[in-house]
């Protein structure tokens, strides 16, 4: 059945009338960091084709990350995957006469077959990461060991500045103090457990930074990380928790106010890079060459080698490899970033 469906969609790609012109659709339906990685490519595409139409197919989270981005003409939001939702989206998108589709990253397997119905002359994506559907691409790009930002720039075929963009809210999430007291942020969570530095290490680091710098400690986290954030705040006298319902633009404004953010490999790390806040990024099982801070002067990567071969990744329930990152090492690197 799978092979029959692939042949059907491949044939459909050739039978449908093809749209032409500079009418582009970006597909990015994964996480916060994945979405931010696409902003340099979107900006470069706009600079190369200033009069083009640029639409973005994304998730509600992705739309929030890209909110107020001046290079995007229109959003198409993928809220659910039932067939009627895709049919409604299909109707809207076909009316836009999309000529070229750039698939940055998608976790939803039906998206690529869906794209074949849009009448685009070109469907471009990196080969090997499309859940066995590479045959539906008109222009498969070779997979390389390169940063995700660079991969997206190559997909759109443009060159440009690699700095990410996000547009923080104008409201200040933290009250100003007089005299000003620096704010140091800790982000102890991550989508996957195997990327998390131990809570006890964050507590010890937060206390040392507070005592040494005389700073305020703010601990950030998503709605599912409230218990983790609360645990760390309780371990650091005077620390403040900042969790949901912060919007992405409010979180960006908060991180922009920080003198430093110490973070696991997760979305807020990329926000810090986008708003130019000094960031200490803690890495072990993931590869910073692919997904770490990229050409960001005010950032440092603190990395240790993996301890399991192969890495268990999402199956890991005790990320002891992350314990290799010592508190003293994190403290000294934090001071170096803070004093700049």
Give, region by region, the residue ranges found by the protein language model.
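Catalytic machinery of carbohydrate-active enzymes
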Residues: 1-340
